[in-house]
Amino acid sequence: TSGIPKLIKKMADDEVKFKLAVSLHSAIGSVRTGIMPFNEQFPLEELREALAYWYQKTKNRITYEYVVWKGINDQKKDVEALIKFCKFAPSKVNLIEYNPIDDGLFEQADEKALLLYKRKLEEAGITTTIRYSRGKDIDAACGQLANKQ
């Protein structure tokens, strides 16, 4: 989910039997809004409150999906904000390698940035995985829909 707070709370109240994964991509409000304009309607503070409620009711760890882009969310301040955002409840972060497309607005972050994220998150006690892409050499990776001529 991208995180509609009232629906996260409703799912917690309904005692749903699945795990929650949130597409976060930034724990800095202005950056997240640039990536996901949806954030203007449902700011991070409201999302965090709903996630705290989710954890309080379900005791289930929260998973965050987090694509790291070059020049957008690949700096030290970004990982520090993510650590702070995650600390209120047990969580897992899936760092996702971006699959570039021709003429795309986003660029894949350097592997060094992904490894820094992973190290810093793990040092903070947050379970972290890096999801590396396969198939991007033939435009068949997740998120790629390309038509090369």
Question: Across the structure, where does each feature detected by a protein language model lie?
Answer:
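Conserved AdoMet/S-adenosylmethionine-binding subsite of the radical SAM
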Residues: 1-120, 124
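Residues at the C-termini of beta-strands that transition into short coil/loop
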Residues: 23-24, 132-134
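Short proline/glycine- and acidic-rich turn/helix-capping motifs at secondary-structure junctions
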Residues: 99-104, 133-140
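Radical SAM enzyme core and accessory elements
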Residues: 123, 135-149
